[in-house]
């Protein structure tokens, strides 16, 4: 596609300044939202840059996203005649706010929510977590005379690897009755 030199330069300036570019996948959009050129020209120029590995492309939710690579930075520096100390915004270090560092002196601030002395136990209402009475009483469970029995052979055939399936007898010599 033939793209005018002015439009090509505008797209390249924006891409180098930000380090990233996006475009909605709408080939009939008359103008890109951030650059004063047709959206189709942005998409086609970025496709060309992608084939030359100047940008890396991601597509999500009907939008293209292009990220400038190191080769692309070098190419755009020469194309736009920029000095080597000028870098895209994605490579600039962000200024950290001058706040307190993590940690600090231990008695400097109160940790956790404010507490009043002795109004609740240390672990809250978790005392009864395991349930049941806390004495040496008889524990709940099966009675002492409980004899569990499992149906084998009689009744219904086993399930899965249970009793051989389809009420078949155990193979002879297997050691099973």
Curated annotation (Swiss-Prot):
Q: Name one GO molecular function term.
A: structural constituent of ribosome
InterPro entries according to UniProt: Plectin_eS10_N (IPR005326), Ribosomal_eS10 (IPR037447), WH-like_DNA-bd_sf (IPR036388)
Q: Where is this region: Disordered?
A: 90-177
Its family? Belongs to the eukaryotic ribosomal protein eS10 family.
Ranges of Basic and acidic residues compositional bias?
A: 108-140
| Compositional bias (Gly residues) | 151-165
Give the source species: Arabidopsis thaliana (Mouse-ear cress)
Corresponding gene?
RPS10A
Pfam families this protein is in? Answer: S10_plectin
Q: What is this protein called?
A: Small ribosomal subunit protein eS10z
Q: Could you state one GO cellular component term attached to this entry?
A: cytosol
Q: Its principal location? A: cytoplasm
Compositional bias annotation for Low complexity: 141-150, 166-177
Which keywords are on file for this protein? Cytoplasm, Ribonucleoprotein, Ribosomal protein
Question: Does the keyword field hold Oxidoreductase?
Answer: no
Any idea where this protein resides? Answer: Cytoplasm
């Amino acid at each position: 596609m033939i793209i005018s030199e002015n439009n090509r330069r505008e797209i390249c300036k924006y891409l180098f300044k930000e380090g990233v570019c996006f475009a909605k996948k709408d080939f009939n959009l008359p103008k890109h939202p951030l650059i004063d050129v047709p959206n189709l020209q942005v998409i086609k120029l970025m496709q060309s840059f992608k084939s030359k590995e100047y940008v890396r492309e991601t597509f999500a939710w009907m939008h293209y996203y292009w990220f400038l690579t190191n080769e692309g930075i070098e190419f755009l520096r020469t194309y736009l005649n920029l000095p080597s100390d000028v870098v895209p915004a994605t490579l600039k270090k962000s200024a950290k706010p001058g706040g307190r560092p993590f940690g600090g002196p231990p008695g400097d601030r109160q940790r956790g929510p404010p507490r009043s002395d002795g109004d609740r136990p240390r672990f809250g209402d978790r005392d009864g977590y395991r349930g049941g009475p806390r004495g040496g009483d008889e524990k709940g469970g099966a009675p002492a005379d409980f004899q569990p029995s499992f149906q084998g052979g009689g009744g219904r055939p086993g399930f899965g690897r249970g009793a051989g399936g389809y009420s078949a007898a155990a193979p002879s010599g297997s050691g099973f009755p």
